[in-house]
């Protein structure tokens, strides 16, 4: 078993059973290709999402260190911050969130609805900043201040994307390979690539478990030149901690995130509407809508290796739909 070293890392059970892997018959008919979806949007805490996989490892480490406060950072509409705050509430921990407004909007829905509304329900301490220009340093500065107030803080990086957090997606690869036993000739896996932990964890896991399957990361905030080093750095760090080699190339498509992170575009919104209309599945304007736009266009442009089935990793994010109204 190439991933047996995963068991060395403490893990807090937050998700329980594997998330569903489903066939999408109407979308498949529409696109002329078998499409499957991994439903990490339906993880069981606070409207779901992929970050719970990372938090199982990160929060286990925080508890091992005796922390009473989780500190993290992200955009006002960050799904990661929402899930971190929910886990903190569930465990009786304090949560401090350092937030930025990456799109510079004054729209009330964006500033107060969606994920931001949920942060208040979880009694999160909000700290605003002009921009997360150096989030690791900014989080450490905040942690020092919180510690001086008598708390025992644990810093969780943006997106939960450290080598430890990304172990959650190495583990996800184990679920995927088991659930895909009946999927004949799986060709490709498509995932949104942002803070890079989900992408890197899958890259390590799938390289060892499904080496013939192509993994495509659709960027949501950066060009390939900017994103690829981030994914590779995490890929190598994860592999090092698991005593594995990681030689698989990192495949990225950067054609679908413009005009920038957190700003909806037409192709992404059309993908959101298409999945809702055909399958009753809710994507979001920031991550999964743009990743699905890449999948759809990739089929049209024949960018995939072959014509086999494609698996889409649904990382969640639907609460942001309310914040982005009336774009939706």
From Swiss-Prot:
Listed cofactors: pyridoxal 5'-phosphate
Alphabetic keyword roster: Lyase, Pyridoxal phosphate
GO molecular function: D-cysteine desulfhydrase activity
Major enzyme class: lyase
Pfam families: PALP
Catalytic reaction(s) noted: D-cysteine + H2O = hydrogen sulfide + pyruvate + NH4(+) + H(+)
Keyword Protein biosynthesis: no
CDD domains: ACCD
Enzyme Commission number(s): 4.4.1.15
Disulfide bonds, paired cysteine numbers: none
Modified residues annotated as N6-(pyridoxal phosphate)lysine in this record: 51
Lyase is among the record's keywords: yes
GO biological process, one term: D-amino acid metabolic process
Family: Belongs to the ACC deaminase/D-cysteine desulfhydrase family.
Subunit structure and binding partners: Homodimer.
Main function: Catalyzes the alpha,beta-elimination reaction of D-cysteine and of several D-cysteine derivatives. It could be a defense mechanism against D-cysteine.
Protein name in UniProt: D-cysteine desulfhydrase
Species this chain originates from: Salmonella typhi
Gene it is expressed from: dcyD
């Amino acid at each position: 078993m190439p991933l047996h070293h995963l068991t060395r890392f403490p893990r807090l059970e937050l998700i329980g059973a594997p998330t569903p892997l489903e066939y999408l018959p109407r979308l498949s008919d529409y696109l002329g290709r078998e499409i499957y979806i991994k439903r990490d949007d339906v993880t069981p805490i606070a409207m779901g999402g992929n970050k719970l996989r990372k938090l199982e490892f990160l929060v286990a480490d925080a508890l091992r260190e005796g922390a009473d406060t989780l500190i993290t950072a992200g955009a006002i509409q960050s799904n990661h911050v929402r899930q971190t705050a929910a886990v903190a509430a569930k465990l009786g921990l304090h949560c401090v969130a350092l937030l930025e407004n990456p799109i510079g909007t004054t729209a009330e829905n964006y500033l107060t609805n969606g994920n931001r509304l949920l942060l208040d329900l979880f009694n999160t301490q909000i700290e605003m900043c002009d921009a997360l220009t150096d989030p690791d340093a900014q989080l450490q500065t905040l942690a020092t201040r919180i510690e001086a107030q008598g708390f025992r803080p644990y810093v969780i990086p943006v997106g939960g994307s450290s080598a430890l957090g990304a172990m959650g997606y190495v583990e996800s690869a184990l679920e995927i390979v088991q659930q895909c036993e009946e999927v004949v000739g799986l060709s490709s896996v498509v995932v949104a690539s942002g803070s890079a932990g989900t992408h890197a964890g899958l890259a390590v896991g799938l390289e060892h478990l499904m080496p013939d399957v192509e993994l495509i990361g659709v960027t949501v905030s950066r060009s390939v030149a900017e994103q690829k080093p981030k994914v590779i750095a995490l890929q190598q760090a994860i592999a090092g901690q698991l005593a594995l080699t990681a030689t698989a190339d990192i495949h990225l498509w950067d054609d679908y995130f413009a005009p920038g992170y957190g700003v909806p575009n037409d192709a992404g919104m059309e993908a959101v509407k298409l999945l809702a209309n055909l399958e009753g599945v809710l994507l979001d304007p920031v991550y999964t809508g743009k990743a699905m736009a890449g999948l759809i266009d990739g089929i049209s442009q024949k960018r995939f290796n072959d014509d086999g089935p494609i698996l889409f990793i649904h990382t969640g994010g639907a609460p942001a739909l309310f914040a982005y109204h009336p774009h939706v």
